[in-house]
Amino acid sequence: MMNICSTFTLLFRLGIFMRLNKYIASCGVCSRREADKLIDEGRVTINGEKAVFGVDVTDTDSVFVDGKKIEPSDEKIVIAYYKPVGVTCTEKDKYAEKTVIEDLGFDKRVTYAGRLDKDSEGLLLMSNDGELINAMMKGSMKHEKEYEVTVDTDVTGDFLKAMSSGMYLKELDRRTRACEVKKTGKRSFNIILTQGLNRQIRRMCAALGANVVKLKRIRVMNVKLKDYDLKPGKYVVLSEQVVKKLYKDAGIAR
């Protein structure tokens, strides 16, 4: 059976119109949401003209992002990358000391599913399949992400209860979902999130008077960092068996 990614590519090459943000995602540049941001920032051109929201493209169009031509690929890969502390999750940032793309040094254009802030480390799943990235980032799907956290105060029963039951974050005007939290040490705990609010764990801890000393993502959906002998800054291409389950859990045919 032809997978959905190959189907998109085939239809596109047969001259079927595709929405620009979807096309950018299918080329592995970024998610659709990030593609909209690129368009808004004027970093996308079609046939030499600055792109606008809502336009469609076909295989006869030349699409460039940041001056580089992009094209869809039939070969879709997923990699597990150990992001080190100090590396910034962004495609391009002139102020960043080092971005994930620069640190990764992969020979295909890939993007990530779910940011880790500069001061955090751990597992990033990266792919050139924008449809997979988009599906993995959908909050409504409640995909699990697990973290090891160390704070500068004792982890009490009240702390665990507040973290797990959900809390209102004033600065985001959002309430966190109830989640699983397990104490692992006097000042450490593991937490499993099913949403990805900006700096969520750090904000939750701060609301309870604790500062995060160390934050490490150890699992994304069915992919566990401990299953791979990865050092910070290193990556591994995931096996077909692991990727197949990842697509299934993300709700994408493969």
Which residues does each PLM region occupy?
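Methionine residue identity
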Residues: 1-2
